[in-house]
């Protein structure tokens, strides 16, 4: 998720105040502008995101993985732990890259109707935890995500996102000569993975 500053309205008010006044009032307005603190890029939204690792490009998709505090959702996805039960919320931010143009997407467009599953495997363990991601919207737009409880606790994990194309009965592509796209959806899930994700517990 991208952070959104809540300080914009204060800055706009100060600017209007300084523009309307004259002389000493104008100077006072400039002082007000100077007093408005600059947004903190890391904390402007009131929370911090933590990357799972570097973003990945797989096929026509640019995939980012981040986590932060558990969230409340409505309606609540049935298979996910609640905000109170979960350790964190994990997001897959999936947008089209340059290759996505062949499917009719613009670079940076959110790609809808995907089926995204995460697999978490702690180093040294044979157990693989499967997490079904759901499409959802936050204040900054759509993503795929889930509240997650790490079943094997703190440690280093391999994290794997498997991203299946939209199902044939839910999403179609134009393929005629006049209006069609040149690309086709992938037949096997695309994979974005990180081998050394360190889960240290809540950092917020």
UniProtKB/Swiss-Prot annotation:
What start and end residues bound the annotated signal peptide? 1-19
Q: Where is the lipid attached (N-palmitoyl cysteine)?
A: 20
Keywords assigned? Cell membrane, Lipoprotein, Membrane, Palmitate, Signal
Q: Which Gene3D superfamilies match?
A: Periplasmic metal-binding protein Tp34-type
Tell me where it resides. Answer: Cell membrane
How does this chain sit within the bilayer?
A: Lipid-anchor
Mark the residues modified by lipid (S-diacylglycerol cysteine): 20
The record ties this protein, via InterPro entries, to:
Metal-bd_Tp34-typ, Tp34-type_sf
Give a yes or no for keyword Cell membrane in this entry: yes
Q: Which Pfam families match?
A: Iron_transport
Q: What does this protein do?
A: This antigen is a pathogen-specific membrane immunogen.
According to its UniProt record, which protein family does this protein belong to?
Belongs to the UPF0423 family.
In Swiss-Prot or TrEMBL terms, this protein is called 34 kDa membrane antigen
What organism is recorded for this protein? Treponema pallidum (strain Nichols)
């Amino acid at each position: 998720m991208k952070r959104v500053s809540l300080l914009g309205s204060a800055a706009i008010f100060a600017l209007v105040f300084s523009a309307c006044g004259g002389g000493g009032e104008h100077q006072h307005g400039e002082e007000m502008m100077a007093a408005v603190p600059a947004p903190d890029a890391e904390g402007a939204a009131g929370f911090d995101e933590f990357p799972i690792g570097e973003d990945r490009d797989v096929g026509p998709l640019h995939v980012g993985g981040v986590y932060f505090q558990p969230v409340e959702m409505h309606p609540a996805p049935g298979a996910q732990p609640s905000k109170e039960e979960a350790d964190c919320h994990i997001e897959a931010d999936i947008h089209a890259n340059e290759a996505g143009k062949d499917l009719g997407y613009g670079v940076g467009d959110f790609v809808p109707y995907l089926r995204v599953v995460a697999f978490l495997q702690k180093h040294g363990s044979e157990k693989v935890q499967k997490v079904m991601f759901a499409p959802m919207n936050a204040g900054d737009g759509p993503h795929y995500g889930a509240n997650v409880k790490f079943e094997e606790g703190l440690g280093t994990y391999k994290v794997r996102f498997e991203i299946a194309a939209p199902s044939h009965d839910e999403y179609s592509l134009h393929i005629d000569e006049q209006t069609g796209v040149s690309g086709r959806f992938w037949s096997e899930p695309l994979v974005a993975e990180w081998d050394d994700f360190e889960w240290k517990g809540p950092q917020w």
